[in-house]
């Protein structure tokens, strides 16, 4: 199974910008930890970061037929991007939204996520550990999806034998 991790604007600056909010860990280090989890759990993982909304939309759309789930930190686009929201809704893949900081404790304009309503879940305020939680959550979601598909296949096979 394959998970695509999509990182939004300014996340390439982690470890440099606003460490009091986002912490000292660099994006590469977060990805290294996620890759380790993926390897331990026999998952394929791919990382993508862009500061451009259209590139993020393109990558989400490219997940059709290529990925089983998406973990996304849309960063500032969380609060403004109908395009990213619509792309996630269109691909119909399990998606988890992650934020390093607790967006609900920050400036009022950050409180509303346009993305969350089309996601399976949202993890906020856990720092880099939030990505680990997202990996655990996505692993569970994908296992449940696989089990449901297996049950459906068995039911179809049984119905065809009758």
Swiss-Prot record:
Q: Any idea of its EC number?
A: 4.2.1.10
Active site (UniProt): 22 (proton acceptor), 99 (proton donor)
Assigned protein family:
Belongs to the type-II 3-dehydroquinase family.
Q: Name one GO molecular function term.
A: 3-dehydroquinate dehydratase activity
Cross-referenced Pfam families: DHquinase_II
Protein name per UniProt:
3-dehydroquinate dehydratase
Q: How does the annotation summarize its subunit structure?
A: Homododecamer.
Q: Keywords for this entry? A: Amino-acid biosynthesis, Aromatic amino acid biosynthesis, Lyase
Q: Which InterPro entries does the record cross-reference, listed alphabetically? A: DHquinase_II, DHquinase_II_CS, DHquinase_II_sf
Q: Which PROSITE patterns match?
A: DEHYDROQUINASE_II (PS01029)
Q: Where is this site: Transition state stabilizer?
A: 17
Domain of life of the native organism: Bacteria
Q: What is the phylogenetic placement of the source species in the record?
A: Bacteria, Pseudomonadati, Campylobacterota, Epsilonproteobacteria, Campylobacterales
Q: Which top EC class is named for this enzyme in its record?
A: lyase
Q: What does this protein do?
A: Catalyzes a trans-dehydration via an enolate intermediate.
Q: Which reaction does it catalyse?
A: 3-dehydroquinate = 3-dehydroshikimate + H2O
Q: Quick one: which pathway?
A: Metabolic intermediate biosynthesis; chorismate biosynthesis; chorismate from D-erythrose 4-phosphate and phosphoenolpyruvate: step 3/7
Please cite one Gene Ontology biological process associated with this protein. chorismate biosynthetic process
NCBIfam families recorded: aroQ, PRK05395.1-2, PRK05395.1-3, PRK05395.1-4
What does the entry list as the binding residues for substrate? 73, 79, 86, 100-101, 110
